């Protein structure tokens, strides 16, 4: 456990995570200073009076006088003010680093471009099914520091690439990178390898590394070693097995669960289940209770969630598909009897949309593209694409055209922030309109 007594601590970024950092230091007898680039950041009204605050920008004077800077994942380490502090030898960490220095129970750590919230929640459910006192959070739900508890027997953390950049003390009992596809290229000017390098930090000092046999970018730089366990569609220690029209989860040659017993559907969810099972096994959770959790878990909202089935038409909310890889996962192996009406658009974060093109062939696809990068997406297949300014306009355009057997799928391949507060608001708006129009 680290000693912060007498340290001049500056926290960048408020919100729930920033407040958890403030509480962490106050509990240890240290009064930090707080700054935020927003004029009225969320949580400002909850700051104790004794805590000095600076809003509407960064305070370079405070930063250069600090002994320790705790940076929000929302601010790039390449920001000139942070670069100057780093050059001056000032330590810069994030909330996950503070957490790792304190945590007394084993940590299962999960990252990846897509599927990480589902896998994190699933491993948490597996632990609960085994009667283990588990804390689940990080980049999903509660900030990690709010999970710290002497009674906790296991922590399951979802970690973003931004969080991993400022973390060096993680020693996970089991760690995974589920997949690596283009995302956040606006924060990684040197491209995919720079983004991957941030993700790879999760394996440092990990006891077991759970890698994706179908994605070489998830492997440690030096290649798979004795710490590695793999999962994949057809390859890997944990893989899918197709026999006589049925699909099984298989571990090292042994069939352990028929997927028809699961509430989750879709190949990407079956591989998520394999990854979760590999992590749970590595963390020492009993296999039987882990499999039981797989049969009861219904999935998370906004992740290929059927929000309406009416007149033979399925309306599916996959608003969490905020990058190209996530939309690819939704379209890969998707079977629709009639026409797929696909809603795409938003802020593409400088991504390359071309990998989607191969899923958009055929006579039964219609594209409805909206938002900031709608024109780029419509260009993938212009002859079947229509462009609108908003998602609502797109849905009102397609609604009279749907027939029994069709699917309306919101899987935008983009962030929502050009028109919505977050992906949840976008998904809720889709669900509301589906119920009105369907």
Swiss-Prot record:
EC number(s) recorded for this UniProt protein: 6.3.2.9
Residues that bind ATP: 112-118
Highest rank taxon of the organism: Bacteria
Pathway(s) per entry: Cell wall biogenesis; peptidoglycan biosynthesis
Gene Ontology molecular function: any one: ATP binding
Compartments where found: Cytoplasm
Keywords in alphabetical order: ATP-binding, Cell cycle, Cell division, Cell shape, Cell wall biogenesis/degradation, Cytoplasm, Ligase, Nucleotide-binding, Peptidoglycan synthesis
Pfam families, per database record: Mur_ligase_C (PF02875), Mur_ligase_M (PF08245), MurD-like_N (PF21799)
Functional summary from the UniProt entry: Cell wall formation. Catalyzes the addition of glutamate to the nucleotide precursor UDP-N-acetylmuramoyl-L-alanine (UMA).
Family the entry assigns: Belongs to the MurCDEF family.
Name of the protein described by the UniProt record: UDP-N-acetylmuramoylalanine--D-glutamate ligase
Source organism (scientific name): Escherichia coli O6:K15:H31 (strain 536 / UPEC)
Lineage: Bacteria, Pseudomonadati, Pseudomonadota, Gammaproteobacteria, Enterobacterales
């Amino acid at each position: 456990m680290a000693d912060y007594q007498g340290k001049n601590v500056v926290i960048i970024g408020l919100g729930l995570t920033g407040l958890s950092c403030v509480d962490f230091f106050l509990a240890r007898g240290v009064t930090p200073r707080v700054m935020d680039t927003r004029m009225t950041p969320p949580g400002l009204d909850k700051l104790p009076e004794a805590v000095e605050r600076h809003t509407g920008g960064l305070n370079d004077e405070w930063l250069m006088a600090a002994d320790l800077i705790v940076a929000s994942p929302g601010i790039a380490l390449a920001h000139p003010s942070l670069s100057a502090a780093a050059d001056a030898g000032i330590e810069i960490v994030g909330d996950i680093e503070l957490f790792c220095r304190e945590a007394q129970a084993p940590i299962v750590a999960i990252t990846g471009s897509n599927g990480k919230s589902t896998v994190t929640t699933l491993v948490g459910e597996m632990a609960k099914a085994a009667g283990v006192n588990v804390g689940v959070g990080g980049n999903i739900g509660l900030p990690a520091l709010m999970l710290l508890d002497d009674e906790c027997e296991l922590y399951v953390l979802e970690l973003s690439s931004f969080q991993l950049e400022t973390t060096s003390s993680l020693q996970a009992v089991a760690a995974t990178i589920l997949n690596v596809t283009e995302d956040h290229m606006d924060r990684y000017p040197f491209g995919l390898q720079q983004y991957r390098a941030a993700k790879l930090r999760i394996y440092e000092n990990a006891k077991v590394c759970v890698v994706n046999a179908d994605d070489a970018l998830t492997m440690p730089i030096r290649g798979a070693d004795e710490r590695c366990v793999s999962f994949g569609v057809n390859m890997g220690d944990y893989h899918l097995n197709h026999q006589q029209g049925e699909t099984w989860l298989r571990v090292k040659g042994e069939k352990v669960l028929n997927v028809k017993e699961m509430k989750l559907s879709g190949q990407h969810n079956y591989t998520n289940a394999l990854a979760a099972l590999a992590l749970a096994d590595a963390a020492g959770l009993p296999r039987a209770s882990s499999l039981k959790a797989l049969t009861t878990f219904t999935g998370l909202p906004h992740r290929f969630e059927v929000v309406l089935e009416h007149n033979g038409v399925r309306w599916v909310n996959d608003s969490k598909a905020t990058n190209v890889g996530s939309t690819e996962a939704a379209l890969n192996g998707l079977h629709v009897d009639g026409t797929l009406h696909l809603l795409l658009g938003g802020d593409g974060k400088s991504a390359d949309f071309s990998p989607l093109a191969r899923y958009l062939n055929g006579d039964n696809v219609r594209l409805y593209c909206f938002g900031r990068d709608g024109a780029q997406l419509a260009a993938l297949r212009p002859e079947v694409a229509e462009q609108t300014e908003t998602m609502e306009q797109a849905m009102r355009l397609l609604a009279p055209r749907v027939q029994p057997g069709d699917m309306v799928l919101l899987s935008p391949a983009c962030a929502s922030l050009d028109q919505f507060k977050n992906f949840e608001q976008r998904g809720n708006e889709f669900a509301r309109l589906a119920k009105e129009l369907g």
